[in-house]
């Protein structure tokens, strides 16, 4: 830092320069020092300005919290005063006097504190506001610029004169005096230096003595606050001493009364033998029978909870054992002491929850064959568990009643809205199991693994899952596909990872033979050593130098495996990534993933969130990933962040929360989600808007198996498969299509789709995991328009719409061949409709009964299948209703043109 100088020194040297020519040389020699000192002073002033900005922010926070404290004290005073009035109405004068006097004292102290907070705002906050205004700083900056300009002019003139002097020496001339020739430039520098020192001195005075004087005034206000509070306490102190003595005497008197009442109760019990009768009733009620009046739970505790309870064992010793328990979807799971044993799963619909009236921390759960005795940590925790159990039971009971199938026509299934997540979860779990490598354990190769690491997306066996649980949730979060109740969002990563893809990265350096990888018969010690090396040390992972630029590219390209490779090589997801060029600003990993996210990159965002994505890390502008999700309208990323417990109330540099940004940008869905999270009503499990791609395997044994795979997912009531004039009912092998007027149906009734034609294409199930608010994808329905011309019926789009539920026109969907499509033999006449005749009156519906229709296989046939088994069924000269893939046009074909699929 350049050497500092005093204003007095500058005044003395400048005065000497003005008074005598000899002082010009002295001032010229000190000009560089003066310039450097001015720059240093400006830097100090800027630093003080930043500190004052922090003080201003803290003072504002103290002022707002102080006002809140005053409001809470006022509510406390009102409650104490109400209690005193209550005792006064009961003629308890000593107690009422104590409560009322303490309420008055609280009011005085609250008034003093409120005055102190207002003084803080007036004495400290207002001067800070004037200091933070940019007028002083702008004037100082202008003076500094003028000073810099004068210095540059002086240097330029000095260089020019030096050249002239050198030229005069060469030519033999007489060089002039530099000090005299530079007098004007020197005077200009002195002028601007004076102006800058004036501005800087004014700023220093306001930031130093003036602000300190304000703090001294606030100190006096604090001194008065404590003095007045001490005086108020001293005036009440004699009364408090007398009150304490009288309250002690009153307590002793009431205790004597209670003791006498206890003795009287015991004597009455002995006389009337009430103890034996109560024991008899207790034994009777503690059996397997159910009480008529069920305990009602507190709805504030919700329907889901995970934690630890003490369960009384059934052995001879009957000791309390600590067990992990969880309530979800109307079921209670109780873990064992050994992690390899699957937990006990109890359906709450067949259970009854009974609080223990004597032990407030205990409650009983009565099932059909035994009674479980539980104990919580305290009474409040016990109340929470009892309420959650009862609420979950009530919710399951309501879902069961609402999901009953109606007796009227057109009803389909019993799930409705309640069954959609469960059906989708079953379908997604089957898809996860069919991923490459998921038929074997990711670590030991055991067959049929059923334990999922939700943050890594891999399947393991029950033995390896025990070691994963020992690692902790930081490395692996294990859930059971069969015992735990998973939501679609928890299967998001597993659907896009798989054991094979994961091990291609995490076991790339593993020797193919003789390596440390365990087998299905290995002991727990071998498994533990290998899993620690694989998941904690990343010893066998594919090696590469962590490059932030490569991770940036992987996130922008939605490359999940490249992100996994960076994670395996120790890339810190909390460090900012440089942009693709030097001009682009740096981005945090999670911020960038949320910013560029789309529907296909949700698994990548979920992976970063669950594996060290630093949910609450702030960017340079103070925005967290939650702010980015609200700013760029990413509601699905917002759901994943809220599932990861991101903080909702964090503010950025502008003082805005994520909810404020969503409101300002008019992103309604993000705003609703953040409001639910802020109010504590955010619903689990999550339903993200993701294209769930579910494959139908070509190895089905029968049409029933294939139909079960295709129709497992039930559609909501809003999506009707039957249009206004087309009535379709669907059974396993029976399709009835009537083009006449259908029976009117309510909006809540669902009609199933016609039986889809069997092929090995992939079925796209989209939008089934949306939020329960009704934001669901449209489902193509059969139109109610009149039949189209024969040309429209023979179009490829019409044929493909019968072959697959995918949208027509997709390049990946080739038209069916002559054996698979619908075709009409030459010479087949199509009857025309006369006026006033509907298709339902002219043609009978086509019925494919299960008795007359054989099951066909799409896989390879056995050699025993003879030609006789391949004879097609006889055709009937009746039409079959068809529709375009988008539901815009309908038509009919005679049954003679319909051929069953042949291999």
Curated annotation (Swiss-Prot):
Organism encoding this protein: Homo sapiens
Primary role: Promotes cell proliferation.
Gene3D superfamilies per record: 1.25.40.950, Ankyrin repeat-containing domain, Arf GTPase activating protein, Arfaptin homology (AH) domain/BAR domain, Pleckstrin-homology domain (PH domain)/Phosphotyrosine-binding domain (PTB)
Swiss-Prot/TrEMBL GO biological process terms: cell migration; positive regulation of GTPase activity; regulation of stress fiber assembly
Residue intervals of every C4-type zinc finger in the record: 441-464
Record region (Disordered): 740-903
UniProt KW keywords: ANK repeat, Coiled coil, Cytoplasm, Metal-binding, Repeat, Zinc, Zinc-finger
Name of the protein: Arf-GAP with SH3 domain, ANK repeat and PH domain-containing protein 3
Domain PH stretches: 302-394
Gene Ontology terms for molecular function: GTPase activator activity; zinc ion binding
SUPFAM superfamilies: Ankyrin repeat, ArfGap/RecO-like zinc finger, BAR/IMD domain-like, PH domain-like
GO cellular component, one term: nucleoplasm
UniProt note on tissues of expression: Highly expressed in primary hepatocarcinoma. Detected in lung, liver and blood leukocytes.
